[in-house]
Amino acid sequence: MLEVMIAAPASGSGKTSVTCGLLQALKDRGLAPAAFKCGPDYIDPMFHRSVLQVPSRNLDVFLAGEERVRELYRRHTAGCGAAVCEGVMGFYDGMTFGGDRASAWDVARLLELPVLLVLHPYGSSLTLAAQVKGMLSFRKDSRIRGL
């Protein structure tokens, strides 16, 4: 099964647009994708649902715990050809200032998902390369596999 998390350095970077476009492309190819959103957000899953015509599930490590998130992911990907999980906020931004618990990275680590990083290059050029380099090396296994 094809699996990917769509994440970004910050909110407002285009994660939801990329996620919905990817879900539609996978659906058009007959892969029956499952859609997920990190955290308790209910707005972005409504956009996912409008593309797929099936529910998008929330994966919230803070509220549900790691084992429940694993179980929900396994249950709702059974029989699917692909799974797309949209990250939350900035990739490493967790529930507390300076912490990464319940961040998109935390969920990607937990579920062993490869990460596609969405970048919003407005007003920058070489600085974007420095930002990506920092994100790749910030954690031993960033799980970032593409931009």
Predicted regions and their residues:
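ATP-dependent carboxylate-amine ligase catalytic core
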Residues: 2-13, 17, 23-111, 119-143
